Amino acid sequence: MANIKANEKSYRQNQKANLLTKGFKTSLKNQLKKTKASKDKKDVEQVYSLADKLAKNNRISKNKARRLKSRAARWSNSATAASR
């Protein structure tokens, strides 16, 4: 543990941020699984929204958000193409 007060505070802040980030990433992963299984347009929109929010707050990189959105769109498009 840190010996300096500022370092102790920094440690607490990092712990809190890590906990938040972990929760957000878990929710994104669960939404991706749901989208891949259902391939519903509403689920894809939720992936878009969640990925954009996380990228905006630097919880994930902007490139990762773009990649995830692209994958979700491909899953949705392949489902609509298969149903034709």
UniProtKB/Swiss-Prot annotation:
* Compositionally biased spans, kind Polar residues: 75-84
Show the Gene3D superfamilies listed in the entry: Ribosomal protein S20
Q: Does the keyword Zinc apply?
A: no
Q: Which InterPro entries match?
A: Ribosomal_bS20, Ribosomal_bS20_sf
The record's Gene Ontology biological-process terms are:
translation
Tell me, in a sentence or two, what this protein's role is.
Answer: Binds directly to 16S ribosomal RNA.
The protein's name? Small ribosomal subunit protein bS20
Species annotation? Mycoplasmoides gallisepticum (strain R(low / passage 15 / clone 2)) (Mycoplasma gallisepticum)
Recorded name of the encoding gene: rpsT
